[in-house]
């Protein structure tokens, strides 16, 4: 039952997710591709996390933060992708009212936590390259733990605002969400209640997270670039550029997509373009991150070779 009579109002008890396409052939193709991407995402990020845990040479702040980015990527993708895969296999996919709220808050939590973790990684590289003598002091174990806890706390706050906003909405019908998951904007469009304080707070907080973290990353890498250009050692400059290039590639993909989905006015692009960008943001980027960070990182490649060598000769 999709609707429930409550006095003078009709309340929605479930939503219909329209998904990416109605073409049955295309649905099978997309199911296969996205399933493969999801399996690579989980296995790739888990492998990176385990490698960092078991390799003593990777027990440094940068890789500590990277392991948490991997955990968040798994969580973010898992909050949406399995549900999307089910959507490809059925004619009409419904999601319960409570399930929609859980999916919305989960995506808000993991997305916000990743923003803060990426900013934390930028600060870590800033200290390592611009203030190397103070690195061990400024990036102590206690500081690293506090930064990670702060990142997750930011995620919890945004998720709390999102779920409070969701439960404050009054859905009278229709209940068809033109998306493949319960995103905030489509739900606001379906709501028949007035925009309230919780919606405004959620919007302001989400925008503030994006602006603040981008500002931290931009300032950190401006100083990093200046410091690298001043380096006399060609080898040192090359190593610093190599590490920074991997990070900046991941950040550009992440924030470029976030900007397109949540910052660019909706009138500038179609709903289908928004869906494609969301697939890239939620499904593809979590798969690419371990590849981006690993392929140009000699420490990770070296640690992987050593672990594989141990397995071969054990």
Swiss-Prot record:
A Gene Ontology molecular function term of the record: olfactory receptor activity
Membrane topology (UniProt): Multi-pass membrane protein
Record-stated family: Belongs to the G-protein coupled receptor 1 family.
InterPro entries: GPCR_Rhodpsn, GPCR_Rhodpsn_7TM, Olfact_rcpt
Keyword line: Cell membrane, Disulfide bond, G-protein coupled receptor, Glycoprotein, Membrane, Olfaction, Receptor, Sensory transduction, Transducer, Transmembrane, Transmembrane helix
Source organism superkingdom: Eukaryota
Function description: Potential odorant receptor.
Transmembrane segments: 29-49, 58-78, 103-123, 137-157, 200-220, 241-261, 275-295
GO biological process: G protein-coupled receptor signaling pathway; sensory perception of smell
A single Gene Ontology CC term: membrane
Name of the protein: Olfactory receptor 5P67
Sugar-bearing residue positions: 8, 268
S-S bonds: 100-192
Gene3D superfamilies, per the entry: Rhodopsin 7-helix transmembrane proteins (1.20.1070.10)
Source organism per UniProt: Mus musculus (Mouse)
Spans within the Extracellular topological domain: 1-28, 79-102, 158-199, 262-274
């Amino acid at each position: 039952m999709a609707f429930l009579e409550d006095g003078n109002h009709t309340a929605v008890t479930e939503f219909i997710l329209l998904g990416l396409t109605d073409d049955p052939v295309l649905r099978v193709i997309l199911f296969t591709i996205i399933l493969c991407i999801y399996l690579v995402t989980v296995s790739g990020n888990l492998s990176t996390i385990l490698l960092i845990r078991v390799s003593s040479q990777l027990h440094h702040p940068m890789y500590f933060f990277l392991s948490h980015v991997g955990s968040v990527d798994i969580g973010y993708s898992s909050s949406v992708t399995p549900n999307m895969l089910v959507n490809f296999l059925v004619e009409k996919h419904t999601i319960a009212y409570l399930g929609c709220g859980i999916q919305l808050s989960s995506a808000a939590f993991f997305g916000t936590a990743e923003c803060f973790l990426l900013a934390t990684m930028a600060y870590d590289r800033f200290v390592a390259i611009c203030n190397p003598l103070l690195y061990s002091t400024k990036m102590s174990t206690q500081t690293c733990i506090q930064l990670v806890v702060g990142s997750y706390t930011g995620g919890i706050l945004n998720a709390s605002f999102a779920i409070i906003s969701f439960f404050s909405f009054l859905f009278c019908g229709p209940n068809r969400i033109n998306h493949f998951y319960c995103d905030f904007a489509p739900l606001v469009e379906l709501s028949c209640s007035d925009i309230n304080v919780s919606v405004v707070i959620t919007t302001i907080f989400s925008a503030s997270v994006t602006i603040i973290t981008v500002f931290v990353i931009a300032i950190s890498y401006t100083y990093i670039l200046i410091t690298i250009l001043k380096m006399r050692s060609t080898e040192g400059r090359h190593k610093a550029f190599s590490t920074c290039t991997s990070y900046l590639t991941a950040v550009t993909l992440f924030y470029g997509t976030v900007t397109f989905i949540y910052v660019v006015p909706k009138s500038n692009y179609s709903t289908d373009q928004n869906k494609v960008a969301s697939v890239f943001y939620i499904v593809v980027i979590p798969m690419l991150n371990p590849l981006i960070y690993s392929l140009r990182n000699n420490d990770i490649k070296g640690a992987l070779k050593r672990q594989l060598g141990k397995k071969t000769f054990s």
